[in-house]
């Protein structure tokens, strides 16, 4: 059976956040993080529907008043002890699209132009044999564990950071994958995901108060090199 190109964008927002309380509705731009993300997605071409999945009545009200689908998340899927893959199975049951795009409110610098680019690239890459698309940013820095250096040598063998092996930071900004494959993988992207590279501003991801303050500063700046 041939898949359609219908895409459901899912904004997953939990009411409780241990590291940064109420992080999904913190003030951002001209509104709050959740509403900011909804307004960004409304400008994206090619979306069949936008869903906010939350256990928070306050967040669902924001989504509903903004004119998107607001679906109350069952209590068991708001519990962090429940495997992420089980929550994804539930998501696959509530979406109409043949493809799911994960769109986190905590990635506020992922702008409409980036979503549009990702969607076009995603369908191209599916034809080339990739199974999904994720956003990553290049990551070249010195890494250590408790035993010492992981990706560099000390002494005369030391290299400048730009000479280190290229690693990739998975940003959580955009994930795109076929709905039925997500159900099969119990994950929101697959083993042959195409890595769409984005810059540090676009990769901003809010997990704690430091991330939040940095994201506000990055959003306020004019991006000198947007991924277009």
Locations of regions flagged by a protein language model:
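Short phosphate-binding loop-to-helix
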Residues: 57-101, 113-117
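Conserved alpha/beta core of the MobA/IspD/sugar-nucleotide pyrophosphorylase nucleotidyltransferase superfamily
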Residues: 2, 83-86, 169-228
């Amino acid at each position: 059976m041939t898949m359609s190109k219908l895409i459901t964008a899912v904004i997953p927002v939990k009411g409780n956040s241990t590291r940064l309380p109420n992080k999904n509705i913190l003030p951002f731009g001209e509104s709050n993080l959740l509403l900011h993300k909804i307004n960004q997605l409304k400008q994206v071409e090619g979306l069949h529907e936008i869903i906010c999945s939350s256990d928070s009545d306050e967040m669902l009200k924001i989504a509903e008043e903004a004119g998107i689908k607001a679906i109350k998340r069952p209590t068991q899927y708001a519990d962090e002890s429940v495997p992420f893959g089980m929550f994804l199975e539930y998501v696959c049951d509530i979406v109409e699209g043949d493809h799911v795009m994960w769109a986190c409110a905590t990635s506020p610098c992922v702008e409409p132009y980036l979503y549009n680019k990702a969607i076009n690239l995603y369908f191209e890459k599916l034809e080339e044999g990739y199974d999904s698309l994720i956003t990553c940013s290049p990551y070249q820095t010195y890494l250590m564990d408790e035993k010492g250096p992981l990706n560099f040598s000390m002494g005369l063998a030391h290299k400048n950071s730009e000479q280190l092996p290229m690693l990739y930071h998975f940003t959580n900004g955009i994930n795109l994958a076929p709905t039925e494959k997500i159900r099969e993988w119990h994950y929101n992207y697959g083993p042959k995901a195409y890595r769409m590279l984005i810059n540090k501003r676009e990769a901003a991801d809010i997990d704690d108060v430091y991330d939040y303050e940095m994201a506000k500063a990055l959003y306020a700046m004019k991006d000198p090199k947007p991924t277009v």
